[in-house]
């Protein structure tokens, strides 16, 4: 079961789109690691997603981003050796939360770390594009780190036209759902807002089952946008003039325990129009995080 003589595989942690992840141990140092094992198709060579992930991960060194220690390339396998993290945010919420809901203090500390990780990505011209509780890993010290850059991609200026297939539906920004292909850093900010609400309640904020259903969930809560609230929205490929018109709801109905300062940040993250969303840098300077400001 050895990935190589250097690491011992201990147990299987999960399977992703193109990889299996094991908990492992460095035979020499005894250090625990996560081994991401990618089977290489002899015809196709290394999947481009894997190559993208590797080249990005090796550059991104930050305390809120999972560290990639090593890449071991054998004939038919690619092994990525990551730092080992105890659990993901979803599991943390299920085991530490009250029916999944976390205390405000904990939500704040995790959000601060999440936004620091996002800022570091964005400062390095990288979009994560697939932020969700399962991609945020927590270690025993309570540190939160961004993982799984399978879909991430360095973005240049001018804005590239990206492929449409990104971000798990529940955390997907309305501009992406409406078919915009010129999205930018603001798509990660929307996902962060969805994750913040979910930490408060223990439930996904917008649990849509299809592209249209996802938009319906969003509009029902945040209000249906139109040309006056979001100029040029009607030019987006998936826009329909017959979207049901909803008025925005008060989020305190869903998150009664949220205070006004936290609500202000949440609403800044969850702006329908991407240009209106707060940036990662601005969000870290928000008064809700005052206690972390030196």
Swiss-Prot record:
Top enzyme class: transferase
Record key words, sorted: ATP-binding, Kinase, Nucleotide-binding, Serine/threonine-protein kinase, Transferase
Disulfide bond entries: none
One Pfam family named in its UniProt record: Pkinase
Active site: 130 (proton acceptor)
Ranges that cross the membrane: none
Record SUPFAM superfamilies: Protein kinase-like (PK-like) (SSF56112)
Domain of life according to the entry: Eukaryota
Keyword Nucleotidyltransferase attached: no
Enzymatic reactions: L-seryl-[protein] + ATP = O-phospho-L-seryl-[protein] + ADP + H(+); L-threonyl-[protein] + ATP = O-phospho-L-threonyl-[protein] + ADP + H(+)
EC number(s) given by UniProt: 2.7.11.22
GO cellular component: cellular bud neck; cytoplasm; nucleus; Pho85-Pho80 CDK-cyclin complex
GO molecular function: ATP binding; cyclin-dependent protein serine/threonine kinase activity; protein serine kinase activity
Family: Belongs to the protein kinase superfamily. CMGC Ser/Thr protein kinase family. CDC2/CDKX subfamily.
Function: When phosphate concentrations are high it phosphorylates the PHO4 transcription factor thus establishing repression.
Quaternary organization: Interacts with a number of cyclins.
Full protein name: Negative regulator of the PHO system
Organism: Yarrowia lipolytica (strain CLIB 122 / E 150) (Yeast)
Name of the gene encoding the protein in the UniProt record: PHO85
